[in-house]
Amino acid sequence: MARAISRRTALLGFPVLAATLASKTVRAQSLPARRVAPDFNEDLFYREDWLGEPWRTPEPVVLIHGNDESSVEWYAWVPRMAQEYRLIRPDLPGLGHSNVPRGFQYSLASLARFVTQVMDKAGVESAHIIGAKTGGSVAMRFAADYPRRTRTLVVVGGPAKPLAIANPSPIPQRDRLGSNAPREMVDYWNTLFSKPDREGVKGLGEAMSKFDLAKEGVLQRISAPTLVITADRSKMHSVEEARAYQVQIPNSRLVVIRSDAYHIAAANADECIGHTLAFLKEQKQGH
């Protein structure tokens, strides 16, 4: 059985590595996903990243991915974010390396509960919660249901109701990544989507087909300081639609970036990370 290896273990060498492999506990890790065997699965798989000074105790950040994806897709966020924060990147049930727990029923509420279980496993009582696309919807439900565990909330291109892509492009992944995405990036995502975890994709799809966070009163229950980031030409929803749900979150603001992608956490990662870090810094200074 493959075991995830920490950055610290990788740096300290073989003796520590051997001790780690002898342990019965599978730990989160900071090394690339290829270090985890493709057939390795567990009920609550997550990756953990901390690239700052080892004597610091960083604040935790939970990164929630979207459908058809896994924790790997936060690759662009790790180098900058992990220098300031301890990153917890779960694979949602049925995706990546996470099994579907016995009796699990897909809904935003159950997915939010799953995130709490990952946090419990990681020893994290509360965290900054960040979600992209479907992960943004899960993040909003999490913040509403678990206010004491939510320090801040960042929603990066997440919908508040079922998706309806306007005038979809005939080119796979072009709507997702936008017209400026290089060919290599499009090819990578096409390869990623050619081998999806069907059970997880179907389950998340069902959960995302029957929800309305505004009508259900979820948005109004979010008390954490919230940043919503959207694109000015996203085919997932217009700026007006994003603003319509953002204003229902009591302590929130909207940032609009110039892009025709709807997966801006990937396509416009640097800009989204910059806004996120500035927001988190501002919230910290305000307390």
Model-derived segments and spans:
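Conserved HGGG/HGGXW glycine-rich cap/lid loop of the alpha/beta-hydrolase fold
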Residues: 48-97
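Flexible "cap/lid" loop of the alpha/beta hydrolase fold
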Residues: 137-145, 150-178
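Catalytic active-site module of serine/aspartate enzymes centered on a nucleophile-bearing elbow/loop
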Residues: 252, 256-287
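Hydrophobic, aromatic-rich cap/lid helix
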Residues: 189-216, 233
